[in-house]
Amino acid sequence: MSRIGKQPIPVPSGVEVKLGADVVEVKGPKGSLTTPVSPLLKYEIQDGSVVITRVEETKKASAQHGLRRTLLANCIEGVSKGFSKVLEVNGVGYKVAVKGNNIELALGFSHPVVIELPKGIEAAAAGNKLTISGFDKQLVGEVAANIRRVRPPEPYKGKGVKYEHEQIRRKAGKSGGKK
């Protein structure tokens, strides 16, 4: 039995869960999300929580059990509380600015890099920190990863874009002596 999958998902007040034939729709104060349903699982709403059980005991059903439960729990948490990721921009002259629906990054290139935010994602810049927030956990993570990919942190000085609590493996510079 999947230890994650067998846990019921509590549905907070203000969140509505609709079980469909091929998708589960979740509506809340922050927005609306859908997640696909696996035919190997059975979804039920009991006592203000969603319970997912397996139809058959196979290895694939066991894998789907934990996955689908976590995806649905992320949808429920997203439409009620939302998710956010914080990025840090380190480097001399490196700047980040939010202009409307775009993020403008000055990261040492000859031109500013402009990244357009998808629908449902918000950004806020404060100093060298950039906060990406939204109700879809996968989309928040994808946008943050795309921003980090523009200039990932380098191991010698640590310059670049990194996640807030990310540890950069540093390398020693040249250690050759003079002749």
Curated annotation (Swiss-Prot):
Q: Where is this region: Disordered?
A: 154-179
Keyword set, alphabetical order: Ribonucleoprotein, Ribosomal protein, RNA-binding, rRNA-binding
Where is this chain compositionally biased, Basic and acidic residues type? 154-169
The cellular component terms of Gene Ontology attached to this UniProt record, alphabetical and capped at eight, are:
cytosolic large ribosomal subunit
Which domain of life does the protein's organism represent?
Bacteria
User: What PROSITE patterns does the entry give?
Assistant: RIBOSOMAL_L6_1
State if Transcription is listed as a keyword.
no
Q: Which InterPro entries match?
A: Ribosomal_uL6-like (IPR000702), Ribosomal_uL6-like_a/b-dom_sf (IPR036789), Ribosomal_uL6_a/b-dom (IPR020040), Ribosomal_uL6_bac-type (IPR019906), Ribosomal_uL6_CS (IPR002358)
List the GO biological process terms: cytoplasmic translation
Locations of Basic residues compositional bias?
170-179
Q: Which GO terms describe its molecular function?
A: rRNA binding; structural constituent of ribosome
Q: Which family does it belong to?
A: Belongs to the universal ribosomal protein uL6 family.
What the protein does? This protein binds to the 23S rRNA, and is important in its secondary structure. It is located near the subunit interface in the base of the L7/L12 stalk, and near the tRNA binding site of the peptidyltransferase center.
Q: What do we know about how this protein assembles, alone or with others?
A: Part of the 50S ribosomal subunit.
Q: Which NCBIfam families match?
A: L6_bact
Question: PANTHER family this protein is in?
Answer: 60S/50S RIBOSOMAL PROTEIN L6/L9 (PTHR11655), LARGE RIBOSOMAL SUBUNIT PROTEIN UL6M (PTHR11655:SF14)
What name does UniProt use for this protein? Large ribosomal subunit protein uL6
Q: Which gene encodes it?
A: rplF
